[in-house]
């Protein structure tokens, strides 16, 4: 699996996930519209705090 891993809105950098990591995720804090994204690989979908938006997917570079 290959996931994007840069904080900018339009991301071109990616990483190859390690064995066992089968989820790509994207996290953004909703109260801070200009905040940076957190993207990467995970073994399960991360749990977010209140006001965090988390999207998880399982295909290559799907965490745009």
From Swiss-Prot:
Disulfide bonds join 3-24, 6-11, 17-41, 45-56, 57-62. Expressed by the venom gland. It is found in: Secreted. InterPro entries: Snake_3FTx, Snake_toxin-like_sf, Snake_toxin_con_site, Toxin_cobra-type. Keywords: Disulfide bond, Secreted, Toxin. Belongs to the three-finger toxin family. Ancestral subfamily. Orphan group II sub-subfamily. This is Weak toxin CM-9a. It comes from Naja kaouthia (Monocled cobra).
């Amino acid at each position: 699996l290959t996931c994007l891993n840069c904080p900018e809105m339009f991301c071109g950098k990616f990483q190859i996930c390690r064995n066992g990591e089968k989820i790509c995720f994207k996290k953004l804090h909703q109260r801070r519209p200009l905040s940076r994204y957190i993207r990467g690989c995970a073994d399960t979908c991360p749990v977010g705090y209140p006001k965090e938006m988390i999207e998880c997917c399982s295909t290559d570079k799907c965490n745009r």
